[in-house]
Amino acid sequence: MAAPLTNNRTPRWVNGQRRKPVTRTTLLTRLSVLWGMGLAAGKLVMGLSVASVFLCLHAFYTACMGLARWLFVRVQTGGRPFGLWSARGCYPAMGGIVLSASVFYMLYSLRLFLGQPSPRYHRYVAIAIAVFTLAEIVLNIYGSVTARRRSEPLLHALRLTNLAASLICLPLAQAAILSFTHTVDLSFYNGLSGLIFGAFAAIIGAWMLFHRPKQPAE
């Protein structure tokens, strides 16, 4: 008698929820969450070692973007983080994280704009910060391009989150490069850059927060 056939496929339903397939974008986002959290930890350690509040603030922002991406991964794979179970709930939640972190970033940039001295880094420290920051920008842009290939609401939210993260990276790269290429204090310009790009990121977060995407059909 022939042995009964077994179905080795992943079940479509787990605990009453529909199990979603892990797409390439979701897998890459999982890796970006790990990379982002590691980068945030590195920024925090470096910021504490050189007593740079500015660098610690960027570590906080990077961690917040990692949290937003984690929400995407959990909901995209069928999870319910914090009670969120669809794009309709996750989309504004990601926007709220982006908006809150961006406003907090702008408040510190305002202090630089009003005259608080900019952080100065040793040449090699500044080069390391600039290189890792530019690498972060490239990865964020790559993530946005990858997510652009599909028009699902959550992928759109991921694309906007990556864009906001890239915008906030620019002032850090600028401050790191200027700290060893110029001897004069450039707090005004660093603060202005932070305010401008922080405002753009905050606008993105606000739009995500109040936008209500259409729920895709099952």
Question: What is each model feature region?
Answer:
Residues 186-204:
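Small-residue-rich transmembrane alpha-helices that serve as helix-helix interface/gating elements
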Residues 143-168, 217-218:
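Membrane-helix boundary/juxtamembrane motif in polytopic membrane proteins
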Residues 133-150, 170-177, 205-209:
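Alpha-helical transmembrane segments in multipass membrane proteins, preferentially the mid-helix core
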Residues 42-56, 109-124, 177-188:
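Helix-coil boundary and interhelical linker segments in multi-pass alpha-helical membrane proteins
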Residues 102-110, 164-181:
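Hydrophobic alpha-helical transmembrane segments in multi-pass integral membrane proteins
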Residues 2-72:
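N-terminal topogenic module of multi-pass integral membrane proteins
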Residues 79-100:
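Juxtamembrane helix-capping/reentrant segments at transmembrane boundaries
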Residues 61-69, 101-105, 123-142, 166, ...:
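Generic alpha-helical transmembrane segments
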